[in-house]
Amino acid sequence: MKRARLEDDFNPVYPYEHYNPLDIPFITPPFASSNGLQEKPPGVLSLKYTDPLTTKNGALTLKLGTGLNIDENGDLSSDASVEVSAPITKTNKIVGLNYTKPLALRSNALTLSYNAPLNVVNNNLALNISQPVTVNANNELSLLIDAPLNADTGTLRLQSAAPLGLVDKTLKVLFSSPLYLDNNFLTLAIERPLALSSSRAVTLKYSPPLKIENENLTLSTGGPFTVSGGNLNLTTSAPLSVQNNSLSLVITSPLKVINSMLAVGVNPPFTITDSGLAMDLGDGLALGGSKLIINLGPGLQMSNGAITLALDAALPLQYRDNQLQLRIGSTSGLIMSGVTQTLNVNANTGKGLAVENNSLVVKLGNGLRFDSWGSITVSPTTTTPTTLWTTADPSPNATFYESLDAKVWLVLVKCNGMVNGTISIKAQKGILLRPTASFISFVMYFYSDGTWRKNYPVFDNEGILANSATWGYRQGQSANTNVSNAVEFMPSSKRYPNQKGSEVQNMALTYTFLQGDPNMAISFQSIYNHALEGYSLKFTWRVRNNERFDIPCCSFSYVTEQ
């Protein structure tokens, strides 16, 4: 092997002290050994060591973990801060072991306390067992079992069949009535006619007609009962019969069954009383000595079993030749018709008399009538209504902003060719209690015959009579709403032409006082026939802002159509 060339400043004395250790030639000292020594780096003899040995400042030392240090004497010591976990303990810097029974410390050795069936065999803990407990081939503790025990599911179970069963994890006998438990003994509950004999057997108590025959309970029978085919039968004869397995009675009219009772069917005049069958007797019939007889009144008699007349006729009647006759005088006003043989009145129908519906009546001329007592009286003069109104004291009857929010009194009084009217308004609710509009109007519309026109469209701030309001001819303090023609109350269509409500000839203007307060004067305008057709009335008042719209009685007048 060719050695590297040595530098001039190389010191051949170990450890060579060359300034560049990497260039140290491979010179192995004669005392180098791999046992604790090594040549690292090459040409340098160093100490081979592992943890916890290390070097510090060129000196060999120990790596110290938690709880270890080197004291001032250079000795390795512990600061007793060793961390332990259960069951190891540390008390006063002494490490110990925490244990409980069955562990114990004997002769400074940890031992195990035990009782039978545990035992120590060859320094091993063992279990003393005997059959049926055994150890199987897998060194597992097992149990030798036989039917009815079973351990197929890993649990020791008792196999059972009815009437045995488990109830609340307890083996019990399952039973129901008539069985019950009496002092933990299974007992049979019995009631008469069952009983217990002296041998504690269940027996049957019976009395006639029951009997025991061939160890079977049977029935002693006598007529009309018989036993046939194991069934009890009833022998019957007419009028008794068996129908639908029921005993019945064969009956014919007039017998019938009412409310499950046998009864006699009767038709008038027969009836049923508490005492028996009876007959209702009408007029002319009576009972005499338990016989039905004819009750004869005056003028009748029985002759040879037949009813005959026994009359003493008084005038104008007479009884002659077995006939009752009427005598008629020549001046009586009565005549006998020879054809119909009827008595007629000989009336002079040309002088105030007539025959109507077979009655003699008086013929009445113009201006005469019959009063409620049937007397002839003079007919009263026909009275023409002169007033149309909403009654003297109406309920809320007008709608302005909401249904029935005002009460309106409107009166039209006919005076020859004029109508004098009045209108007043009482606010009831809503906006009318605090109005803010500039003007508020009330309108009435009429057909061409003068009758009230309902459901006519209105504009803002206008009120009309509600459909439920009362409007008609005055009748006392109320009104007759049967108004079929009231043209005579309507404004003249010539004087107040239609569709000219904005012109002066169709209007009237005056003043009134809101709420009747002289300090709140407001204008009042009446307009006639402002609508497109028919007749109309429109009344308009100026509004005081937020002041209740109560209008006192306002008067108006106009020329009528007729």
From Swiss-Prot:
For this UniProt entry, what is the primary localization, expressed as one broad class? Answer: virion
Keywords tagged on the record: Capsid protein, Host nucleus, Host-virus interaction, Late protein, Viral attachment to host adhesion receptor, Viral attachment to host cell, Virion, Virus entry into host cell
**Subcellular compartments:** Virion; Host nucleus
Gene3D superfamilies in the record: 6.20.10.20, Adenovirus pIV-related, attachment domain (2.60.90.10), reovirus attachment protein sigma1, domain 1 (2.10.25.20)
Instruction: Kindly give the SUPFAM superfamilies that the UniProt entry links to this protein.
Output: Fibre shaft of virus attachment proteins (SSF51225), Virus attachment protein globular domain (SSF49835)
What family is it from? Belongs to the adenoviridae fiber family.
Entry function:
Forms spikes that protrude from each vertex of the icosahedral capsid. Interacts with host receptor CXCAR to provide virion initial attachment to target cell. Fiber proteins are shed during virus entry, when virus is still at the cell surface.
What UniProt notes about the protein's domains is: The tail region anchors the fiber to penton base capsomers, whereas the shaft, built from several repeated motifs, allows the knob to protrude from the virion.
How the protein assembles, per its UniProt entry?
Homotrimer. Interacts with host receptor CXCAR. Interacts (via N-terminal tail region) with pentons.
Additional comments on file? All late proteins expressed from the major late promoter are produced by alternative splicing and alternative polyadenylation of the same gene giving rise to non-overlapping ORFs. A leader sequence is present in the N-terminus of all these mRNAs and is recognized by the viral shutoff protein to provide expression although conventional translation via ribosome scanning from the cap has been shut off in the host cell.
Which protein are we looking at?
Fiber protein 1
